[in-house]
Amino acid sequence: MASNRHTSPWWWIPTLYFAEGVPYFLVTSVSITLFTQLGMPNGQMALFTSLITFPWVIKPLWSPFVDVIRTKRWWVLLMQALMCISVFLLAWLAPQGYFTTALIFFTITAFASATHDIAADGFYMLALSDKQQSAFVGIRSTFYKIANIFCQSLLLMLVGWLQKHTSVAASWTYTLLGCSGLLALITLWHSLFMPRAESELSPTLKTDTQTPIRQSIWHEVGTTFVEFFRKSGIGLALCFMLLYRLPEALLLKLCNPFFLAAKDAGGLGLSVETVGQIYGIGVVLMLLGGIVGGLWASRVGLRKAMLPMALCLTLPSFVYVYLAAVQPDSFWVISACIGIEQLGYGLGYTACMLYMIHFAEGAHKTAHFSLCTAVMFLGLMLPGMVAGYIEEPLGYLGFFWVVMACCIPSIAITYVVCRKL
């Protein structure tokens, strides 16, 4: 068995970060298309698919417990097995209309995925030397992004292809069973090839052996929270993290329902397979935008880059106004519009990440960055909860005009932040 300290990172890093991405995108993206196709109204769909992302908001609360209870490797394998079982049950329950039970298992998948994130990132730092960590940072990022393409494009294309030969419910059952089987194979693979790190006890707790573990954990959590909320400019930073992605938070919940809705209902009347193809193009351009945005920000500096990148994130949302008003039939016109929007999203999201890295600088950089991402998730979750209820009385065209109006606070808070940098 290759389960030892000297296993090459190539044997487990690609699959580890692919496994980190798949359940995340299943919960945050694929669930929207699933419930839309199964007939859930937009208001309920947006509300419930937002609520099931709550584990990523509160993830920092239990992160210290993962550091001290058992090992990171144990947590990784346990969470992968739990996600495998949860998705397996989803495959049978959701397509049959057991929505409440399905939402419970989506929430379990989300909790397991959030915990897996903590354990995987911690294991990465324990199992690799500093030199190896630097060498593989691009690899882990690449395979996480491949998981994005897999879920938002390839899975939807598979669902659409299956729907040509079977029912909507059966197509989702077969697809989710395939995802469960893939997660099972990855879990087995990691049980064989993930190395056993020599020491996985939290350094903080090693230095204080006289203090009970539980007391040490809560002291560490409390100190981290207090110092975070005492940071200079915390009020402005929180406003930025909550408002910067406001237009995107609304769009995320209604994009796919808009694509799938019939034209007489204000949508584009696309098949699931076509939506997957369009997002295949869009996600690639989003990744390109992220690369270009990072390079440009490093060249001109965050202060000069932030406002233009915020405009790149928000203003391309206008393509949805155009699509809802014109309702074009051309695959290439629709793909070009989504490609522009996704390219802008990639550029704009980079600015958000760079600002959070900048704000988190200090004694507890990693923990404070985790809190920043939690606040950012809250900024996505809360608007997403009401997105469907905004769309239902207004229709898609009216809803997209509301999204454009929401660009104003996003750009305004970015302007204020830029002046303070």
Enumerate the language-model features and the residues they cover.
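Loop-to-transmembrane helix entry
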Residues: 40-54, 264-285, 333, 367, ...
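C-terminal membrane-cytosol helix-exit motif in multi-pass small-molecule transporters
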Residues: 180-202, 413-418
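Glycine-rich segments within core transmembrane alpha-helices of 12-TM secondary carriers
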Residues: 56, 135-159, 373-384
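C-terminal ends and interior cores of transmembrane alpha-helices
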Residues: 77, 81-97, 311-329
